[in-house]
Amino acid sequence: MDFLEVTKANYVGGHKIHLWFNNDVDKVVNFENLLQGEAFAPLRDENYFKNFHIAYNTIEWDNGADFAPEYLINQ
């Protein structure tokens, strides 16, 4: 099996992102309760949170914060 990848991501609102994966699964993930710890502190600001990009097969923010696609698909 190939590695799981996020292929597309759209900001929905609040701390929610609609994600598409390379295994034909798509879902809206609510990150509100996932933003624990210092690395994710900037993402608690919705204006910062919505400025993500796809890098290394997942979503990433400018501060280097990211989530493994395997984790995201199970949320």
Predicted features, each with a name:
Residues 1-75:
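Motif-centric detector for short Cys/His coordination patterns
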